[in-house]
Amino acid sequence: MRNLSTLVGGTAAALTLAAAISCGGDDSNNSTGPSGSCTPSTNPATLVIQNNAICPQSITIARGGQLTIINQDSRSHDMTSDPHPSHTDCPELNQIGFLNSNQQRQSGNLTTARSCGMHDHSDPDRSTLKATITIQ
């Protein structure tokens, strides 16, 4: 009986460890994006949408630059500036707007130093689809 309980306990521990790893239990290399949900672009002025998540969720862009968003998700997204529903923080971000799956678009030139939030207008409360853009 003791061997059976040891086997069951060991199996449960192994399953727990496997679940933690497969759910992105180690997010040490991706502190600004949702763990295991999205792979950031190698372009520093680009956000990527995958699996209902945007990453990274925090990005810094030089004044005068533009933000690019690539929608690699299976559904469309309507990316706009905060706050919802007025979208007035950074109107330049509103030029990105509606993105079909596998579509990308750029913002207007971000010329004013500030910090702006953005979100998916169609799903404004989903935290994994919110990002902060810092313009320096």
Residue ranges and their predicted role:
Residues 1-22:
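Sec-dependent bacterial lipoprotein signal peptides
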Residues 16-43:
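Bacterial Sec-dependent N-terminal signal peptides
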Residues 21, 36-37, 53, 88, ...:
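Extracellular secreted precursors and ectodomains with disulfide-bonded cysteine-rich loops/domains
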Residues 28-29, 97-136:
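Extracellular/periplasmic metallocenter environments
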Residues 39-66:
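N-terminal edge beta-strand
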Residues 57-75, 80, 104-112, 116:
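Beta-strand cores of secreted/periplasmic/IMS beta-sandwich domains, seen most often
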Residues 72-75, 83-87, 124-125:
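Acidic glycine-/aspartate-rich tracts in secreted/extracellular proteins
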